[in-house]
Design a protein with these regions (language model features):
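A glycine/proline-hinged amphipathic helix-loop "lid/cap" segment
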Residues: 1-99, 349-353
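Gly/Ser-rich "nucleophile elbow"/oxyanion-hole loop immediately N-terminal to the catalytic nucleophile
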Residues: 173-188, 208-209
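Short amphipathic alpha-helix adjacent to the substrate-entry channel of hydrolases
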Residues: 127-146
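Short beta-strand/loop motif that positions the catalytic acidic residue
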Residues: 285-287
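Short beta-strand element of the alpha/beta-hydrolase
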Residues: 109-119
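Hydrolase active-site cap/lid region
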Residues: 203, 207-263
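Catalytic active-site module of serine/aspartate enzymes centered on a nucleophile-bearing elbow/loop
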Residues: 330-353
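Alpha/beta-hydrolase active-site loop
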Residues: 156-176, 340
Length: 353
């Protein structure tokens, strides 16, 4: 990642064997409100994901995760919501996009948030994230959102999910007039694995070039970027976060298959492998000080700066992975939501005459 010597030292050895990470260190303390929320859930952290329990956990997640219908999302009349099936990648299936925008604004093109859900690349869906996005961003900022239903691992491994996201973005930008969006004001974003896909998508769009979309920004919330697990935060003691090192390793193996840990893994599979982070959209990068993915997110923002790019980095003190969902009323959650919204507002503001 980046062009500095520190990145090359952190690459996987030529043998393909994963470099052993640092010894586990003490974890920063959790924010008191977040610690109380974890305790209220009955345990410090959920059972880690393993290859043995992954299929069962996927079934359980699919059964209980919300999947609101188009009618439910638009029931109060404030939003226009549509479910679209668009051409997928070559030799791949169609991609489902869930599109929403504030009602009554059909007369002018709106900026677009093109969003990829979290779930470790193995869980989640495009519908469950929309109520929060509609409430926090679509109405206050008067923007449109498209949430992507990409294929999940291990049934579909790299590059399938990323190519689904790319195909959907190309279609959306090419149909900006029909969708009522401003193709010059597109932000790609996501949370956790979805943020990792957004970072990979920014690299892919840049490198494929041509007449394709040109995102204005990338919103990376606790991004999952590095398959190598070689950072200090990536080896923190278990039991202090809702996302632990064992689960992280399990989902990377599911997503990459035989390419897991390979020395020649493309940066589009794990953006922390990138050696050129120049000419990328402006980035908002957010991590918690007490989460496994902290160090790779901080390093990614730093590498963007080293490449001459724009990045806004927030390390929320005492925050674990997914803290805003764990404790939606916590002061730290309010601060994080305000910071995200301010960044989007600044980035998407129409140019002054």
């Amino acid at each position: 990642m980046g062009s500095g010597e520190g990145v090359r030292r952190g690459s996987v050895p030529a043998t393909g064997e994963r470099r052993r990470g640092p010894a586990p260190r003490a974890a920063p303390p959790l924010d008191p409100e977040l610690g109380a929320a974890l305790a209220a859930n009955g345990s410090r952290a959920p059972e880690p994901l393993t290859p043995a329990n992954l299929a069962d956990r996927q079934r359980r997640d699919a059964a209980r995760r919300p999947r609101p219908t188009v009618e439910e999302l638009g029931a109060d009349g404030r939003f226009e919501v549509a479910e679209l099936r668009v051409p997928g990648p070559p030799d791949g299936p169609e991609v489902t996009l869930v599109s929403a925008r504030p009602a009554g604004l059909a007369g002018r093109p709106l900026p677009l948030l093109y969003y990829m859900h979290g779930g470790g690349l193995v869980m989640g869906n495009a519908w469950s994230v929309l109520p929060r996005i509609l409430r926090e961003w679509v109405l206050p900022l008067e923007l449109a959102v498209i949430s992507v239903e990409y294929r999940l691992a291990p049934r579909t491994q790299y590059p399938g999910p990323l190519e689904d996201c790319y195909a959907g973005l190309v279609w959306a930008a090419g149909h900006a007039g029909v969708l009522g969006i401003d193709a010059d004001r597109i932000v790609i974003g996501g949370k956790s694995a979805g943020a990792g896909l957004a970072a990979a998508l920014a690299l892919l769009v840049r490198d494929r070039g041509g007449a394709g979309p040109r995102p204005l920004g990338q919103l990376l919330l606790s991004p999952m970027l590095d398959d190598r697990g070689s950072t200090f935060s990536g080896h923190r003691p278990a039991g202090h976060d809702v996302w632990d090192p064992a689960s992280n390793e399990t989902v990377w193996k599911a997503a990459l298959g035989d390419r897991y840990g390979a020395a020649d893994l493309p940066p589009y599979a794990a953006p922390a492998r990138a050696t050129d982070l120049s000419r990328l959209p402006a980035a908002y990068v957010e991590v918690g000080s007490a989460e496994v993915l902290r160090d790779e997110g901080v390093a990614y923002a730093n590498a963007i700066w080293q490449a001459g790019g724009r990045a806004e980095l927030h390390v929320w003190p005492g925050a674990c992975h997914g803290f805003d969902s764990l404790a939606p009323r916590a002061a730290l959650t309010r601060d994080a939501r305000d910071a995200r919204t301010r960044w989007l507002r600044r980035l998407l503001a129409p140019p002054r005459a």
